[in-house]
Amino acid sequence: MLLNKITFFERFEHDILSGAKTITLRDEAESHVITGQILPVSTFETDRWFCDIQIIDVTPVKLTELTEMHAKQENMTLPQLRDVIAEIYPGLEQLFMIRFRILLQ
């Protein structure tokens, strides 16, 4: 079943709105989106809408395959990215990279 919205922690809102964050790494349950799909984006904490995004593509990626390029697209260093993934998805190896672009209002 396709996602009909996506949430991000509030701490990522500025990076998304500024265009600094252009991907998100998710588990399998949150990977059900398709190229071209438009999703409303809300904060995880309060479900407050702050923008819409369009999905560019979805690619499986293992935690061990993450590179500095992934980290740059997340607007983090690689160690920061690995720490965030470990915090959100402890013990998970298989991730899905969702590349997106923000839709201007």
From Swiss-Prot:
The active site is at residues 21, 24, 74. Its EC number is 3.5.1.135. Keywords: Hydrolase. Catalyzes the hydrolysis of N(4)-acetylcytidine (ac4C). Residues 7-93 form the ASCH domain. The keyword Hydrolase applies. PANTHER family: UCP029143 FAMILY PROTEIN. CDD domains: ASCH_yqfb_like (cd06552). GO terms for cellular component: cytosol. Belongs to the N(4)-acetylcytidine amidohydrolase family. Gene3D superfamilies: Hypothetical protein (2.30.130.30). This is N(4)-acetylcytidine amidohydrolase. It comes from Shewanella baltica (strain OS155 / ATCC BAA-1091). It catalyses: N(4)-acetylcytidine + H2O = cytidine + acetate + H(+); N(4)-acetyl-2'-deoxycytidine + H2O = 2'-deoxycytidine + acetate + H(+); N(4)-acetylcytosine + H2O = cytosine + acetate + H(+). One of its GO terms (molecular function) is N4-acetylcytidine amidohydrolase activity. InterPro entries: AC4CH, ASCH_domain, PUA-like_sf. The keyword Cell membrane does not apply. Pfam families: ASCH (PF04266).
